[in-house]
């Protein structure tokens, strides 16, 4: 699989707690995502806020085993990222990806105690199988996602919980693409329901102007879409 460009948005990690959770005992419990990248992001956020210190050199592959100092005696509960909001009632705090927080009816901006900086480089990308990155279908999808219409939707819909990272949004179309040849075709793309499928729905409207159908397939995990792209079952 090949990364094409860091498009569209950054899903921010937020540290949240349930109202009424005191964490007043000898230790507190924090739920964190258990996949490699998001667990490291959670730990780096906690380090940035002064709750823990990681071993020297621990970065995007950090796990709880890389914690060097834990002065608040935090106990960590490692949970599949999509399930972190569901265990919030059982822990004192949780570090949640903003897309999953939004799906759980949480507001990452208003409800969080801390958030990743808006300049976080963990941007979501459009990924296709190596060799397909310069096809007209992929370029058409890329142009639609990098449009001003999509950027405006992200700003208005998510109010800072999700951030567009497109530097110069366009009109949604790529002059190098033969849209007449693409008319009547279908582009398939896998995405999580919130916010990715919602954002893709805006791109779908843009592509429909050229009689191109965008088939959005929703998944709740990160792994299966990657496998489907690699196998060629979906386009992106």
Q: Which residues make up each language-model segment?
A:
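C-terminal motif of bacterial Sec signal peptides marking the signal peptidase cleavage site
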Residues: 16-20
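Short, well-ordered beta-strand elements
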Residues: 26-31, 182-194, 212-218
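Alpha-to-beta junction loops
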Residues: 28, 51, 72-75, 89-96, ...
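Periplasmic-binding protein-like
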Residues: 40-43, 47, 137, 145-166
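Short, polar/charged alpha-helical segment
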Residues: 44-51, 57-65, 193-215, 224
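Short helix-initiation/N-cap motifs at beta->coil->alpha
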Residues: 58-86, 216-227
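Short beta-strand->loop
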Residues: 63, 77, 105-119
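A bilobed periplasmic-binding-protein/Venus flytrap-type ligand-binding module shared by bacterial periplasmic
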Residues: 122-140
């Amino acid at each position: 699989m090949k990364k094409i460009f860091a498009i569209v948005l950054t899903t921010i990690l937020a540290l949240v707690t349930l109202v009424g959770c005191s964490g007043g005992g000898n230790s507190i419990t924090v739920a964190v995502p258990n996949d490699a990248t998001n667990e490291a992001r959670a730990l780096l956020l906690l380090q940035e806020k002064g709750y823990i210190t990681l071993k020297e050199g621990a970065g995007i592959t950090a796990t709880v085993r890389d914690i060097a100092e834990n002065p608040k005696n935090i106990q960590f509960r490692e949970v599949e990222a999509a399930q972190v909001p569901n265990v919030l009632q059982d822990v004192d705090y949780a570090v949640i990806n903003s897309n999953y927080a939004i799906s759980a009816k949480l507001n990452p901006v208003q409800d969080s105690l801390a958030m990743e900086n808006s300049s976080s480089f963990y941007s979501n990308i459009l990924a296709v199988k190596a060799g397909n990155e310069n096809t007209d279908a992929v370029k058409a999808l890329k142009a639609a996602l990098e449009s001003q219409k999509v950027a405006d939707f992200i700003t208005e819909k998510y109010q800072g919980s999700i951030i567009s990272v497109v530097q110069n949004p366009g009109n949604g179309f790529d002059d190098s693409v033969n849209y007449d040849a693409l008319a009547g075709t279908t582009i398939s793309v896998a995405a999580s329901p919130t916010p990715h499928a919602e954002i893709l729905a805006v791109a779908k409207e843009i592509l429909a102007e050229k009689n191109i159908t965008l088939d959005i397939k929703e998944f709740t995990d990160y792994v299966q879409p990657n496998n489907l792209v690699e196998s060629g079952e979906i386009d992106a």
